[in-house]
Amino acid sequence: MRAHNLNRATDLGDRVEVADGLWDRFMGLMGRRGLEVGAGLWLTGSNGIHMMFMRFAIDAVFLGRPDPERDSARPVMSVHRGLRTWIGLVPFVRGASSVLELPVGTIERTGTAVGDLIALEPAAGDVPA
């Protein structure tokens, strides 16, 4: 998937994986060695994350529910830069319904801020499910 910031005309990632099942959301990025620029993980149905058992820091963008008047773009509810391994924790973000986990520096590089609208759409080369 592609995560595109409509307000800033920037891509947060063009290789974003979707974790929509219980096991996929539980595992998240645990066990991975890192994320390349452009990669990410979209945790659906989540409004909090932890960094236990993680091997690398991440940026996290918490998204609200899709806005049908804005082509189902999701508003940014909260941003967290450089969440550190083992001690990083965001237990609950009011109004969030999903989380984008991204490489450190993505939030700064894209200028993403609370209130921006993020479109999540198939990326070039994605195979429909």
Regions found by a protein language model. Give the residues of each.
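Compact, glycine-rich, soluble single-domain proteins
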Residues: M1-A129
